[in-house]
């Protein structure tokens, strides 16, 4: 006899074979605020559908303040990893250069708009750390796969933080499935 479909036991049995149809029937949409660089990584997950905030139509003041990226040292053993041991003096020097670059980029963007250049052209000078919003919709199965994959070692720190935030929302929205996956 099968357990009732709404019980944790059913969810647990289904999680063992999470590719089954039961996880294709429910979906979740999240708004994710990130940078253009990380959004490009997220958009590669093809089992989701996406809508990204268009900088083409945004006013320049809507683009937000560009935050300095967290500079880390390249891991010498794993090319997909970074370490938090960058020399503080090197970090400080590079951050000062980034501030100058980002300010110059924003000024050039604003000047291009004032000169009548189309926003779709002017946005090309904006840094990859310009903030953006994406709306990400996927099935329960897609979210399980994404969260497991992007919470794992080897994922860029900023992307991993997004995956962990997605896991938090997922556990609130799908508590029985999360319990079966031992995410709680």
Where are the regions that the model predicts?
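Family-specific signature for flavin-dependent thymidylate synthase
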Residues: 1, 11-184
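ABC ATPase NBD coupling module
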Residues: 4-5
């Amino acid at each position: 006899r099968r357990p009732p479909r709404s019980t944790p036991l059913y969810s647990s049995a289904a999680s063992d074979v999470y590719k089954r149809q039961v996880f294709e029937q429910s979906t979740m949409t999240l708004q994710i605020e990130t940078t253009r660089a990380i959004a490009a990584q997220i958009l590669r997950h093809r089992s989701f559908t996406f809508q990204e905030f268009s900088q083409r139509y945004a006013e320049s003041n809507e683009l937000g303040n560009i935050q300095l990226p967290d500079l880390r040292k390249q891991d010498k053993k794993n090319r997909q990893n970074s370490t938090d041991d960058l020399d503080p003096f090197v970090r400080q020097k590079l951050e000062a250069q980034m501030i100058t670059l980002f300010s110059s980029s924003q000024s050039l963007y604003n000047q291009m708009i004032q000169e009548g250049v189309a926003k779709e052209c002017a946005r090309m000078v904006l840094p990859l750390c310009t903030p953006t919003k994406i709306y990400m919709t996927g099935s329960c199965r897609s979210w399980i796969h994404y969260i497991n994959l992007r919470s794992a070692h080897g994922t860029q720190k900023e992307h991993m933080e997004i995956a962990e935030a997605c896991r938090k929302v997922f556990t609130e929205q799908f508590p029985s499935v999360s319990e079966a996956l031992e995410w709680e």
